[in-house]
């Protein structure tokens, strides 16, 4: 503060002159890297659940889904060695098994990472797995009905009729022999065994498809329940934080009393 001396009626009076106040304003600009890192942190926080833990039940269902998909693909290879049916022509054993493997991998990745985006993708894959498994089940049931029909049995058994010699040859007559009958019966016996084997493959494939539907629905139910529980927990945390912030509001400033100045 600057001082000045003034003489009033022979008396020196010292007065002070107020100096001008200087206000220094410093504006800090964040760099582009800091802004990018902050945006990535906000995105990661938005796409992830807070304090998420691994559900081992869901993880085991994902591993089971992968195994069922692998078994489905192996059965698809085995079915191609049998008679040509609609089940083989459609290739449903391969595409339904591939979708099941992808759904299982999606479940495992989601449980290990606990992200919102991975959760949505895994649920979409589970829906696709259920749809493809249902379509494969319908084809498997149709193939079972056809393989157990009488027309299919006669069609397969007719391939052994070529082993029987003709009744009249061009130059001489040929009679049936016990050897030709034995070969025909042996051929039909082998064909019957092969028919039963591929029928067992078809039954096993249909059961695998039904299990894929059950596992997919169970995984989808657990995923939806976990998502609803996490969302409700986030809402409760936000409400608690709002209550705490509302309770910590600053108290009202006290009223200033006017002090009378005596002359």
Curated annotation (Swiss-Prot):
It is a multi-pass membrane protein. The modification Phosphoserine is found at residues 249, 253. Keywords: Differentiation, Membrane, Nucleus, Phosphoprotein, Transmembrane, Transmembrane helix. The chain crosses the membrane at residues 61-81, 89-109, 125-145, 197-217. InterPro entries: CD20-like, TMEM176A/TMEM176B. It is found in: Nucleus membrane. Overexpression of Tmem176b alters maturation of bone marrow-derived dendritic cells. Belongs to the TMEM176 family. This is Transmembrane protein 176B. It comes from Rattus norvegicus (Rat).
């Amino acid at each position: 503060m600057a001082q000045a001396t003034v003489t009033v009626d022979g008396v020196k009076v010292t007065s002070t002159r107020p100096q001008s106040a200087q206000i220094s304003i410093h504006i800090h600009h964040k760099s582009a890297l800091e802004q990018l890192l902050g945006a990535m942190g906000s995105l990661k926080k938005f796409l992830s659940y807070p304090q998420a833990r691994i559900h081992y039940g869901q993880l085991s269902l994902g591993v089971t889904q992968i195994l069922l998909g692998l078994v489905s693909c192996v059965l698809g290879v085995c079915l191609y060695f049998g008679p040509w049916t609609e089940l083989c022509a459609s290739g449903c054993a391969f595409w339904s098994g591939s979708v099941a493997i992808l759904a299982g991998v999606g479940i495992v990745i989601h449980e290990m990472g606990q992200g919102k985006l991975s959760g949505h993708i895994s649920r979409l894959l589970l829906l696709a797995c259920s749809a493809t498994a249902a379509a494969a089940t319908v084809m498997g049931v149709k193939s079972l009905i056809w393989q157990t029909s009488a027309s299919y049995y006669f069609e397969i058994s007719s391939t052994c009729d070529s082993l029987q010699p003709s009744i009249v040859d061009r130059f001489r007559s040929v009679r049936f022999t016990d050897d030709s009958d034995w070969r025909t019966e042996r051929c039909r016996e082998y064909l019957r065994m092969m028919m039963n084997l591929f029928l067992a493959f078809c039954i096993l494939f249909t059961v695998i498809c039904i299990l894929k539907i059950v596992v997919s629905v169970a995984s989808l139910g657990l995923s939806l329940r976990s998502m609803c529980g996490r969302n409700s927990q986030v809402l409760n945390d936000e409400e608690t934080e709002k209550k705490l912030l509302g309770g910590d509001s600053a108290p009202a400033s006290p009223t200033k009393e006017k002090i009378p100045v005596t002359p």
